[in-house]
C-alpha cells in the first residue's frame, strides 16, 4: 500500500487494474493515455472522533503512465476518511478500461489501472475507452473474424441433400478470400476434404473430387494415376537390383570416399533390357492352349478357319496348321518385333536347345513381291464384295420405305 497526498491511499491489490470507490480515478498503463474520472460521496467515520470528513482528495500512483486524481465532499468538519473498493467491469486483456466499481462508501468508477483514496462515495461518470496508440501491446486476444455468409447451393457431385456454402472474409490480412463449407442433409458442417471422406466412407469416391469447386475433376484422377505410375518406389518394387554404381563408404568423414572394387574379370558388363523387364512373365508357347477351340458367329455356326500360305510350315513336335495359325496371330498382336520364324537350321535336330522362344513355331520364310501382289488382289476382291453387299442393303431399305409410304397414302384416301 502506498500513501498519496490529499489523504488518499493506493491499495496494492488495485495496481493491476482496480479502482478504489472512495475517489475518482484516471489513469492507465503504457498502452492507455487516460482513463475515466469520477467523484464519490459517503460518510467516513474516524475512530475516537465524532466528525465527518470535510473534503478529501487522493492521488494514486501505480504501475501506470498517468496517476489518478479524485476528490469528494461529504459533510462538515475536518477529518480524514478512507474509501476502499474494487473496480468491476468488462474488458479483454490487461490494461483495458473498466468501469462500474463499487466500494464501502457507495458506488464509484474509474479507469482500469488507476487507484485513489479519499472520503465519501458516489457515482462516477463513465467514459469511452481511448484507442490504443501505435507501438502498444494491443488490446488483448483477437475477436472473431468478420465474414459475409454466402448462399447455400446444391452440390451435384455429392449425394442428394448435400449443400455447399462459400463464405467471403471481410476483415484481416486475408480479406477478400473465401472459405468453402459443406453441409450434410442432417445439417452437419464440414470444413475440409478429409473430414468429408471420413464421414462418407466408401459410399462416394472422392479421389477426383475438387473441394473448392464442388465438382468431379477427371484430370485430377489421371494425375494421381500418373504419379503412382512414375513413382520410383513403385517401379523398383519386386525388381532385381542391377545397379552397378559403387556405394559410398559409411565413415565419419566430410569427404565422400567411394568403395574400392576388385574383380577377376574387369571386362564383364551387366546387360539390361528395360523392355523385357517391363513385360509380365508368361508361359512359353501358351498358344497351344487354344488348340481344339473354334469361334462361332451369332447363329452359332462354326466359323471356318483361314488357310495359311504354303510358305508357312510348322516346326517342332506336335505342330499342325491350327497351332501355327494361333501362334502367328498372337505374335502379330502382342509383339512389335518382325516375325521371321525359326531361322536356325539346327532347330530340327534338337528343338529343346535351339528353339527361339520369341518367334512362332514355323520355319523361316521369305515374303516375295509375288506374295504381296497376290495379297493385294485378294484384298481388292473382298472390298468389292463388301461394297456390293452394302449397296444391296441400301436398295432393299429404300424399297421397304416406299412400300410403307404407299400403304399409308392408300389408307388416308380410304
From Swiss-Prot:
Compositional bias segments (type: Basic residues): 77-95
Biased composition (Polar residues): 232-244
Family matches, as InterPro entries: DNA-bd_dom_sf, MBD2/MBD3_p55-bd, MeCpG-bd_2/3_C_dom, Methyl_CpG_DNA-bd
Subcellular location: Nucleus; Chromosome
One of the protein's GO biological processes: response to estradiol
Location of Phosphoserine modifications: 184, 410
Principal subcellular localisation of the protein: nucleus
Keywords of this entry: Chromosome, DNA-binding, Nucleus, Phosphoprotein, Transcription, Transcription regulation
Tissue: Highly expressed in brain, heart, kidney, lung, skeletal muscle, spleen and testis. Detected at lower levels in embryonic stem cells.
Region (Required for interaction with DHX9 and PRMT5): 1-152
GO molecular function: C2H2 zinc finger domain binding; chromatin binding; DNA binding; identical protein binding; methyl-CpG binding; mRNA binding; siRNA binding
Span of domain MBD: 148-216
Record field: compositional bias (Gly residues): 98-123
Chain positions covered by the region annotation Disordered: 1-163, 217-244
SUPFAM superfamilies to which the protein is assigned, alphabetical: DNA-binding domain
Assembly, per entry: Heterodimer with MBD3 (via N-terminus). Component of the MeCP1 complex that contains HDAC1 and HDAC2. Component of the nucleosome remodeling and deacetylase (NuRD) repressor complex, composed of core proteins MTA1, MTA2, MTA3, RBBP4, RBBP7, HDAC1, HDAC2, MBD2, MBD3, and peripherally associated proteins CDK2AP1, CDK2AP2, GATAD2A, GATAD2B, CHD3, CHD4 and CHD5. The exact stoichiometry of the NuRD complex is unknown, and some subunits such as MBD2 and MBD3, GATAD2A and GATAD2B, and CHD3, CHD4 and CHD5 define mutually exclusive NuRD complexes. Interacts with CDK2AP1. Interacts with DHX9.
Designated name of the protein: Methyl-CpG-binding domain protein 2
Species in which this protein is naturally found: Mus musculus (Mouse)
Gene behind the chain: Mbd2
Amino acid at each position: 500500500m502506498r500513501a498519496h497526498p490529499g489523504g488518499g491511499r493506493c491499495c496494492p491489490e488495485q495496481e493491476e487494474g482496480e479502482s478504489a470507490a472512495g475517489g475518482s480515478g484516471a489513469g492507465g498503463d503504457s498502452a492507455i493515455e487516460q482513463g475515466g474520472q469520477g467523484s464519490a460521496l459517503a460518510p467516513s467515520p474516524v475512530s475516537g472522533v465524532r466528525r465527518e470528513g470535510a473534503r478529501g482528495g487522493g492521488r494514486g500512483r501505480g504501475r501506470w503512465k498517468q496517476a489518478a486524481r479524485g476528490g469528494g465532499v461529504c459533510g462538515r468538519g475536518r477529518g480524514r476518511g478512507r474509501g476502499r473498493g474494487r473496480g468491476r467491469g468488462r474488458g479483454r486483456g490487461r490494461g483495458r478500461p473498466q468501469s462500474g466499481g463499487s466500494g464501502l462508501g457507495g458506488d464509484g468508477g474509474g479507469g482500469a489501472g488507476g487507484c485513489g483514496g479519499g472520503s465519501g462515495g458516489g457515482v462516477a461518470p463513465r467514459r469511452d475507452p481511448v484507442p490504443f496508440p501505435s507501438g502498444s501491446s494491443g488490446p488483448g486476444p483477437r475477436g472473431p473474424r468478420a465474414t459475409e455468409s454466402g448462399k447455400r447451393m446444391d452440390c451435384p457431385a455429392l449425394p442428394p441433400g448435400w449443400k455447399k456454402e462459400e463464405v467471403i472474409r471481410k476483415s484481416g490480412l486475408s480479406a477478400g478470400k473465401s472459405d468453402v463449407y459443406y453441409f450434410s442433409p442432417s445439417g452437419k458442417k464440414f470444413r475440409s476434404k478429409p473430414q468429408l471422406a471420413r464421414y462418407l466412407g466408401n459410399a462416394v469416391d472422392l479421389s477426383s473430387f475438387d473441394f473448392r469447386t464442388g465438382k468431379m475433376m477427371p484430370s485430377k484422377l489421371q494425375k494421381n494415376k500418373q504419379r503412382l505410375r512414375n513413382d520410383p518406389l513403385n517401379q523398383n518394387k519386386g525388381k532385381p537390383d542391377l545397379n552397378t554404381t559403387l556405394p559410398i563408404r559409411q565413415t565419419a568423414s566430410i569427404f565422400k570416399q567411394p568403395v574400392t572394387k576388385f574383380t577377376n574379370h574387369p571386362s564383364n558388363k551387366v546387360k539390361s533390357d528395360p523392355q523385357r523387364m517391363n513385360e509380365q512373365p508368361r508361359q512359353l508357347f501358351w498358344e497351344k492352349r487354344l488348340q481344339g477351340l473354334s469361334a462361332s458367329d451369332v447363329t452359332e455356326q462354326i466359323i471356318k478357319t483361314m488357310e495359311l500360305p504354303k510358305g508357312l510350315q510348322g516346326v517342332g513336335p506336335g505342330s499342325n496348321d491350327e497351332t501355327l495359325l494361333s501362334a502367328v496371330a498372337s505374335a502379330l498382336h502382342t509383339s512389335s518385333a518382325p516375325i521371321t520364324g525359326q531361322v536356325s537350321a539346327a532347330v530340327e535336330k534338337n528343338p529343346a536347345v535351339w528353339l527361339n522362344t520369341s518367334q512362332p513355331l514355323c520355319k523361316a520364310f521369305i515374303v516375295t513381291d509375288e506374295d504381296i501382289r497376290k495379297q493385294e488382289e485378294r484384298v481388292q476382291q473382298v472390298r468389292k464384295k463388301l461394297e456390293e453387299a452394302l449397296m444391296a442393303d441400301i436398295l432393299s431399305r429404300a424399297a421397304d420405305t416406299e412400300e410403307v409410304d404407299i400403304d399409308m397414302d392408300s389408307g388416308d384416301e380410304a
